[in-house]
């Protein structure tokens, strides 16, 4: 039996609180059960050097965990003097995922930075970051249009992500930490609103998984992500 008696295909209780901070062009507190991530979108004029003069924008991301977002305190990476490999991998994933949602040519020479700070971790922090940052990004783009800095909204559609895995032989959606740590197979799936895949990251931690199990996990992820899309739309319409 899963924690909180969730069904195998069920996403944890999901909340997206917009305008959570007052300074950023977009800010969202996203909560998947006990996982809580603050996602902010910052708009700046100009682009990285490698894009100058090309008439297109850029979307990048940074990810971090508060020292006591986990069971025991982890030192800040700033205190260590460098970011860890996991952090770099996750923030690149967030940036890639959100760039897929935007027509960078229509964005013009603006850079949008998505900062995802984990306040409390209970599994699925990278997928929660993507789903929350998408809403923060949508708010930031809407403000660019409303201010007259952009003629049309360059957002092509929503992006959401969820974790799936096989735990004790059963395929489960949106893994909590206790499930993730015991999973035989762990997978993160990122999708566009139209159903196309942006990224699939899957690893067999113990027993290798079959082709049929892979397809079952992707179907499970699709259903969970559809629930997240509905929550994103409801938040943006509120």
From Swiss-Prot:
Task: Give the residues the record marks as binding phosphate.
Answer: 86, 124-126
Coiled-coil parts of chain: none
Q: Is Cell inner membrane set as a keyword in this record?
A: no
User: Which top EC class is named for this enzyme in its record?
Assistant: transferase
Catalytically driven reaction(s)? tRNA(n+1) + phosphate = tRNA(n) + a ribonucleoside 5'-diphosphate
Q: What is its EC number?
A: 2.7.7.56
| Gene Ontology MF terms in the entry | 3'-5'-RNA exonuclease activity; RNA binding; tRNA binding; tRNA nucleotidyltransferase activity
- PROSITE patterns for this protein: RIBONUCLEASE_PH
What InterPro entries does its record include?
Answer: ExoRNase_PH_dom1, ExoRNase_PH_dom2, ExoRNase_PH_dom2_sf, PNPase/RNase_PH_dom_sf, Ribosomal_Su5_D2-typ_SF, RNase_PH, RNase_PH_bac-type, RNase_PH_CS
Family (UniProt): Belongs to the RNase PH family.
Its assembly, as annotated, is: Homohexameric ring arranged as a trimer of dimers.
Explain the purpose of this protein: Phosphorolytic 3'-5' exoribonuclease that plays an important role in tRNA 3'-end maturation. Removes nucleotide residues following the 3'-CCA terminus of tRNAs; can also add nucleotides to the ends of RNA molecules by using nucleoside diphosphates as substrates, but this may not be physiologically important. Probably plays a role in initiation of 16S rRNA degradation (leading to ribosome degradation) during starvation.
User: Mind telling me what this protein is named?
Assistant: Ribonuclease PH
